[in-house]
Design a protein with these regions (language model features):
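Catalytic Walker B motif of ABC-type/P-loop ATPase nucleotide-binding domains
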Residues: 158-161
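Conserved ABC transporter NBD signature motif
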Residues: 57-65, 74
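Helix-to-loop junction immediately C-terminal to a conserved catalytic motif
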Residues: 49
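Conserved ABC ATPase "signature" region
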Residues: 102, 109-128, 181
């Protein structure tokens, strides 16, 4: 569960990015933040993984205040998919998906099995896509790789910041529907 208890963010110049927020997102629940550009959606999500620290209040993941969790531990337990996808252009699809597994020091066999499983899960057969590079993929395929990477280490929390905003409207609808189907299977 993710809990915001009076969590707010005010920048040093006095700009209020997030007014005090009380919100609970239960395990396995999909929560979508909707609002105008600049209203604090991204800042709210960034407070969960401490890319932004709350000015007041607390943000908790599974009952632990994120400010008390060692940063590396916190971030390794959260999958994160962003609008710009954030794939490493010099790494193959396979190596992009394996990034977090490597940070967790998984052995090669476990990592390879997990990468294959995740690529299959997002509809990118490993034999066909594993050795490709991001520039060889469509926008929707790159987004799927980003989702596979975010899920590879089986994090208890998955944050997605406008994950389908960079693709065309038809692909976006298809990816959103696929994500909801995927979420039902993995319960993230």
């Amino acid at each position: 569960m993710i809990s915001f208890n009076g969590a707010s963010k005010t920048y040093p110049d006095g700009t209020v990015a997030v007014h005090p927020l009380d919100l609970q997102v239960r395990t396995g629940e999909v929560c979508v933040l909707v609002g105008a550009s600049g209203c604090g959606k991204t800042t709210t999500m960034r407070m969960v993984n401490r890319l932004q620290e709350p000015t007041t209040g607390t943000v908790s993941v599974d009952g632990r205040d994120v400010m008390s969790v060692p940063l590396r531990e916190l971030r390794l337990g959260i999958g994160y998919v962003i609008q710009q996808i954030g794939l490493f252009p010099h790494l193959s699809v396979r190596k992009n998906v394996a990034t977090v597994c490597g940070l967790l020091k998984w052995d090669k066999a476990k990592t390879n099995d997990r990468v294959d499983e995740m690529l299959d899960l997002v509809g990118l057969p490993p034999a066909e896509f594993g050795d490709r590079y991001p520039h060889q993929l469509s926008g929707g395929q790159r987004q799927r790789v980003g989702v596979a990477r975010a899920l590879a280490a089986d994090p208890p929390v998955l944050l997605m910041d406008e994950p389908f905003g960079a693709v065309d409207p038809i692909a976006r609808l298809h990816l959103q529907n696929e994500f909801l189907s995927l979420q039902q299977r993995v319960k993230k």
